[in-house]
From Swiss-Prot:
One Pfam family hit: TAS2R
Keywords, comma-separated and alphabetical: G-protein coupled receptor, Glycoprotein, Membrane, Receptor, Sensory transduction, Taste, Transducer, Transmembrane, Transmembrane helix
Source species: Papio hamadryas (Hamadryas baboon)
Ranges per topology, Cytoplasmic: 29-55, 107-128, 206-232, 283-303
Source species, domain of life: Eukaryota
Gene3D superfamilies with a match to the protein in the record: Rhodopsin 7-helix transmembrane proteins
Organism lineage: Eukaryota, Metazoa, Chordata, Craniata, Vertebrata
Function statement: Receptor that may play a role in the perception of bitterness and is gustducin-linked. May play a role in sensing the chemical composition of the gastrointestinal content. The activity of this receptor may stimulate alpha gustducin, mediate PLC-beta-2 activation and lead to the gating of TRPM5.
Protein name: Taste receptor type 2 member 13
Length: 303
């Protein structure tokens, strides 16, 4: 029964891998073509491009770690290979989370309307704010890598003291649990910032819609429709982001109690976030949405 469920989850992971690479790759391709043709790219398109690149890397890392964990191959990886694999996972996960958070801050500063002097100051300097936040996150990345490297070194030393590299499968959680715990702790900051940003954005959009409904009774202008669509995308993103964060927590707890099935199930749900959210970003971006419709029309015409 357990092997059948793992086979089903593996098929789901592969499907998410293909969908995630196609959707994120599409966004990178369209923005790069636009960048080459126009010699410039808007701030939001730059964020979307680098976000898509980081998620492609993250999806590949998640797929590799899935098959390594599924076939118990992680314990046979050399010390250098282990560091490369985990460091690349940490870096891709870091930029995936923080670029998504920066995107939420960008939307907040661009769309939301508050009368606070501090908010207006940040709103007028949105590009500088985004750049400073991105540079500031490198401090978190550096600290994260240092802490992860300590866990790797301790685990490798423990393996050497046991004189057998694959001393036991029960020893693997002694390495993976502290790594997952560290990743969870460093994910708290971007998750909290994104949550606050989107709650403020939702509050601002609702307030704006209420004002427009009073001024335009029985009439819905294009701007109102755009705000409603933005609100739907924001809520969807918030739910996906929350589910991804919860999966990290549950996965860490399941490994602590060595529950393989729950751990694999959480990994499957976790991959759904970087794979599916790109579709929401494509639908929410006029340029990407138009390009996707053109591609879909050409594919349909060839059929």
């Amino acid at each position: 029964m357990e092997s059948a469920l793992l086979s089903i989850l593996t098929l789901v992971i592969i499907a998410e891998f293909v969908i995630g690479n196609l959707s994120n790759g599409f966004x990178v391709l369209i923005n790069c073509i636009d960048w080459v043709s126009k010699r410039q790219l808007s701030s939001v398109d730059k964020i979307l491009t680098f976000l898509a690149i980081s998620r492609i890397g993250l999806i590949w890392e998640l797929l590799v770690s899935w098959f390594l964990g599924l076939h118990y191959l992680a314990i046979f990886v050399s010390g250098t290979g282990l560091r490369i694999m985990i460091f690349s996972w940490v870096v891709s996960n870091h930029f995936s989370l923080w670029l998504a958070t920066i995107l939420s801050i960008f939307y907040l500063l661009k769309i939301a309307s508050f009368s606070s002097p501090a908010f207006l100051y940040l709103k007028w300097r949105v590009n500088q704010v985004i750049l400073m936040i991105l540079l500031g996150t490198l401090v978190f990345l550096f600290l994260n890598l240092i802490q992860i490297n300590i866990h790797i070194k301790d685990w490798l030393d423990r393996c050497e003291r046991n004189t057998i590299w694959n001393f036991s499968m029960s020893g693997l959680p002694t390495f993976s649990v502290p790594v997952k715990f560290t990743m969870t702790m460093f994910s708290l900051a971007p998750f909290t910032v994104a949550l606050i940003s989107f709650l403020l954005l939702i509050f601002s959009l609702r307030k704006h819609l209420q004002k427009m409904q009073l001024n335009y009774k029985g009439h819905r202008e294009p701007r109102t429709k755009a705000h409603i669509n933005a609100l739907k995308i924001v809520i969807s993103f918030l739910l996906l982001y929350a589910s991804f964060f919860l999966c990290i927590l549950i996965s860490w707890i399941s490994e602590l109690y060595q529950n393989t099935l729950i751990h694999m199930f959480c990994q499957t749900i976790g991959v759904f976030y970087p794979s599916s959210h790109s579709f929401l970003l494509i639908l929410g971006n006029p340029k990407l949405r138009q390009a996707s419709l053109l591609v879909a029309a050409k594919v349909w015409a060839k059929r």
